[in-house]
């Protein structure tokens, strides 16, 4: 049940609480009624209701014989029947009406005579339980209160006695009889007939005692039920007041703050809280004639003490219980029950002091320390110390919200505006806390990248923080501060300038119109020049025509420009220009034809030059003897290295292999396979170059012995290598057109040729269709027709040349790679270009390596001793042997094998 109440204290939860209380009371009443029903059955077995005679079987029992044979008890019971109901003759009616008196008389008799001592206590407990009169029987009586004098009850209809049935409606909720207001009457003494010889008691008095006993039982039951319900409700209220889970928040403020709320005499009416309590209870006036009981009303003075006790136990909630059924809030801090204990509850309380304004609160600079408490403003009050601010408003209350409580740390509020002139600030120094909190002039931002400080490691910034550098605050404000006055002036000037600008009619998109206006101003092109070019076929800048075609208006914009009948001056510069252009028939088709006329000559020159480069490159690559020598050297070297593997015995290879020669290194880690190939080629190419030089001269003065001597001399060997190295290094210049052809975009070249053919076809169709149908005889038409006639032959020749050159390139690719693909020929030029770059680098390294031993030998010869007169018998080593020892060993092995 606590979980159900904590889910919400609305109207639905109040109804649930009342339902559980009614169910609890009904269960208690049903429990109390079960025993009387059993007593009816037992008594009917003991004595017949119709005749009033004792049952023979029950009479035979020992305890029944002892009690029933006592004539005093029987006579006393019969006497009470006759005195109470002298006019009744029917024993069944006597049994039905005086069932309670009979049981009481028998029980008193048995207890007084002591005839049940030592017997089974089961029957004594049964008879004792017969005395419990349930509250339901009292509520079903016709009268609201008994009469002080005995009166004759109304006669009942004859019929068999019925056990008391349960009422259809539950008993009233929360009925309470405080013991302090109506103390119960003293219980009837059970030993009133202790002595059989004493004077008989009057029947009316004895009946009144029994009725008082019934009333006491009912009052005790009701009070117990009410106390349990109140205790349960108090526990639930405290539990629900501490937590806010599931409760609907009331967004309305607690108070409507105004100037009158700050007065001491103002008050808040709390009468509604008692009224709300009053609605939750029912009034019970059982004894309305005597005025013993009263309803729970907030205006009744008899219940003021109990109400104050309840308020003190519940903590004096500041907010009244609303109609939604919300529980009262906790008492504010500082409010205790003792303060209100001595005051009478008049329905109103004094107002609480308002919360101090936010600008009086001082926020701490340190994030770890809480803000210091700010004393509330002193208010004249004679009732004691000022009360703290009220708690948060309940949900649903209207009115403006009170100022929120201060957080742990928030932004500093702006200071109040000062009316006087601002005093000059001194240079910055060791400022105190007040100077730090003072507002500072906003300066221009300095954009940098902040670095997060790491507390675990010491940084240079830790020492800088404690430095002694100070800057002049006035100077930095004057240099880098925002000039508010100048800015306002500039804003005024800008606003006045904008207001002075005329408002133009915009038809184009703002961005398109702005770009077109900038283009017209940049190229200094007027509308008249453009219109004359479109009518007469004059030449215009290519960039201008291309930009106009890119920024051509959409069909909707073009239609608006043509249908515009207003003043031209109201249009913008871009709209005015396009308005004049679109008035010319087929203006943008004329621009396309004009662009073709202006760009055809340049494009044809580029295409012809590219075709020439490709043709020369193919011829150079096919006819280069040195390039073929390199391919031969690489093929033989590769077959030797791949001997015995599936890669060996190759007859050709793709030219991509040339790019891998520099990646294969020797055992020394420096000599590459490309170095080896170059070393082998430069000697043979040097001898060939020397022979070519000699053949160019006259052989009449040259003898064969001289040639042999020169070939075997050391100087001639060095000369051959130099000549061969220069020859190999000149391969890059020999294949110059190949390197240039590698930069040609084959797709771009083919696209340019196709675009020229398409533009020619489009221009021919425009002249033969649109312009011929319009019947226009202008200079533009004549110029375009003449241009088309001259361009047709050139474009057709370019198309034929493109087919021939592309076939030549493809055949060159097939010449080196076998069956090449579509673009394999142009890719071949790229491979050769990259190989020539690597070859030039290798030749440079070989030249540097050959010059290093010569310099070392000369240095050793200059430092040798002058006493060595005998010639050196050791033959001079070949510089290639000094550079590449692996080559020397290989040659020694070959010579030894030849001698064998």
Curated annotation (Swiss-Prot):
Region span, Disordered: 136-209, 273-440, 849-900
Biased composition (Low complexity): 359-368
Pro residues bias (residue ranges): 160-173, 369-429
GO aspect biological process, one term: actin nucleation
Keywords: Membrane, Signal-anchor, Transmembrane, Transmembrane helix
Reported tissue expression: Expressed in the endosperm. Localizes to the cell plate, a plant-specific membranous component that is assembled at the plane of cell division.
Major localisation: membrane
Transmembrane segments: 15-32, 214-234
GO MF: actin binding; actin filament binding
Compositional bias ranges of the Polar residues kind: 281-304, 860-876
InterPro entries hit by this protein: FH2_Formin (IPR015425), FH2_Formin_sf (IPR042201), Formin-like_plant (IPR027643)
Topology in membrane: Multi-pass membrane protein
The family this protein is said to belong to: Belongs to the formin-like family. Class-I subfamily.
SMART domains found in the cross-reference section: FH2
UniProt protein name: Formin-like protein 5
Gene3D superfamilies registered for this protein in UniProt: Formin, FH2 domain (1.20.58.2220)
Role summary: Might be involved in the organization and polarity of the actin cytoskeleton. Interacts with the barbed end of actin filaments and nucleates actin-filament polymerization in vitro. Seems to play a role in cytokinesis.
Ranges for domain FH2: 433-865
Biased composition (Basic and acidic residues): 307-316
One cellular component (GO) term of this entry: phragmoplast
Cellular compartment(s): Membrane
């Amino acid at each position: 049940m606590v979980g159900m109440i904590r889910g919400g204290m609305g109207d639905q939860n109040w109804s649930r609480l009342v339902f559980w209380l009614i169910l609890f009371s009904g269960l208690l009443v049903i429990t109390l009624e079960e025993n009387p029903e059993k007593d009816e059955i037992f008594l009917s077995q003991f004595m017949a209701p119709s005749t009033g005679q004792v049952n023979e079987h029950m009479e035979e029992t020992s305890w029944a014989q002892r009690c029933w044979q006592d004539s005093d008890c029987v006579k006393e019971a019969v006497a009470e029947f006759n005195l109470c109901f002298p006019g009744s003759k029917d024993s069944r009616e006597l049994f039905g009406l005086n069932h309670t008196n009979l049981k009481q008389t028998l029980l008193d008799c048995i207890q007084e005579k002591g005839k049940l001592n030592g017997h089974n206590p089961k029957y004594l407990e049964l008879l004792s339980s017969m005395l419990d009169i349930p509250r339901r029987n009292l509520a079903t009586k016709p009268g609201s209160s008994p009469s002080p004098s005995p009166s004759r009850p109304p006669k009942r209809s004859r019929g068999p006695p019925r056990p008391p049935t349960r009422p259809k409606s539950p008993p009233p909720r929360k009925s309470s009889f405080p013991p302090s207001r109506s103390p119960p009457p003293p219980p009837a003494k059970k030993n009133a007939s202790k002595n059989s010889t004493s004077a008989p008691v009057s029947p009316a008095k004895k009946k009144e005692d029994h009725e008082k006993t019934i009333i006491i039982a009912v009052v005790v039951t009701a009070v117990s039920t009410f106390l349990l319900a109140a205790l349960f409700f108090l526990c639930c209220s405290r539990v629900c007041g501490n937590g806010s889970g599931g409760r609907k928040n009331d967004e309305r403020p607690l108070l409507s703050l105004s100037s009158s709320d700050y007065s001491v005499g103002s008050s808040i009416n709390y009468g509604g809280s008692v009224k709300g309590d009053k609605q939750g209870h029912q009034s019970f006036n059982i004894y309305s004639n005597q005025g013993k009981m009263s309803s729970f009303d907030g205006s009744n003075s008899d219940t003021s003490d109990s109400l104050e006790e309840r308020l003190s136990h519940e903590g004096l909630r500041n907010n009244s219980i609303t109609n939604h059924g919300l529980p009262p809030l906790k008492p504010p801090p500082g409010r205790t029950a003792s303060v209100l204990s001595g005051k009478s509850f008049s329905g109103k309380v004094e107002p609480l002091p308002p919360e101090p304004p936010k600008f009086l609160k001082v926020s701490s600079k340190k994030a770890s320390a809480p803000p210091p408490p700010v004393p509330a403003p002193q208010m004249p009050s004679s009732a004691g110390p000022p009360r703290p601010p009220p708690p948060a408003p309940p949900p649903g209350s209207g009115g403006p919200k009170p100022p929120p409580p201060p957080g742990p740390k928030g932004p500093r509020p702006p200071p109040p505006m000062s009316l006087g002139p601002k005093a000059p600030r001194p240079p910055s120094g060791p400022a105190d806390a007040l100077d730090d909190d003072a507002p500072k002039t906003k300066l221009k931002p300095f954009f940098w990248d902040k670095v997060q400080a790491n507390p675990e490691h010491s940084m240079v910034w830790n020492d800088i923080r404690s430095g002694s550098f100070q800057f002049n605050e006035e100077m930095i404000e004057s240099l880098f501060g925002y000039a508010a006055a100048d800015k306002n002036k500039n804003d005024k000037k800008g606003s006045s300038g904008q207001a002075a600008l005329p408002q133009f009619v915009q038809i184009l998109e703002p961005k398109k119109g702005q770009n077109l206006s900038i283009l017209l101003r940049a190229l200094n092109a007027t509308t008249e020049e453009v219109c004359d070019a479109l009518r007469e076929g004059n030449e215009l800048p290519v960039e201008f025509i291309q930009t106009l075609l890119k920024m051509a208006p959409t069909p909707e914009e073009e239609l608006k420009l043509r249908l515009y009948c207003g003043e031209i001056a109201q249009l913008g510069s871009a709209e005015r220009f396009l308005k004049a252009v679109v008035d010319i028939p087929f203006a943008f088709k004329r621009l396309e034809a004009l662009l073709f006329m202006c760009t055809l000559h340049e494009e044809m020159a580029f295409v012809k030059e590219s075709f020439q480069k490709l043709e020369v490159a193919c011829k150079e690559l096919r006819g280069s003897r040195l390039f073929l020598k390199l391919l031969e050297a690489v093929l033989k070297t590769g077959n030797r290295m791949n001997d015995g593997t599936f890669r060996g015995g190759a007859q050709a290879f793709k030219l991509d292999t040339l790019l891998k020669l520099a990646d294969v290194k020797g055992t020394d880690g420096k000599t590459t396979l490309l170095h080896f190939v170059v070393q082998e080629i430069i000697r043979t190419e040097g001898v060939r170059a020397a022979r070519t030089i000699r053949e160019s001269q006259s052989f009449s003065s040259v003898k064969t012995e001289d040639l042999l001597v020169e070939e075997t001399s050391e100087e001639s060997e060095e000369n051959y290598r130099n000549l061969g190295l220069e020859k190999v290094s000149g391969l890059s210049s020999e294949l110059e057109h190949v390197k240039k052809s590698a930069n040609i975009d084959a797709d771009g070249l083919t696209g340019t040729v196709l675009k020229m053919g398409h533009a020619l076809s489009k221009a021919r169709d425009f002249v033969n269709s649109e312009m011929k149908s319009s019947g226009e005889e202008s200079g533009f038409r004549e110029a375009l027709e003449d241009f088309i006639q001259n361009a047709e032959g050139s474009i057709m020749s370019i198309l034929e040349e493109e087919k021939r050159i592309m076939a030549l390139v493809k055949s060159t690719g097939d010449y080196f790679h076998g069956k090449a693909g579509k673009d394999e020929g142009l890719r071949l030029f790229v491979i050769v270009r990259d190989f020539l770059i690597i070859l030039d680098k290798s030749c440079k390294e070989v030249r540097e390596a050959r010059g290093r031993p010569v310099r070392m030998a000369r240095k050793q010869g200059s430092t040798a001793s002058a006493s060595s007169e005998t010639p050196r018998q050791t033959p001079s080593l070949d510089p290639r042997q000094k550079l590449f020892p692996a080559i020397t060993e290989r040659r020694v092995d070959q010579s030894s094998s030849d001698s064998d």
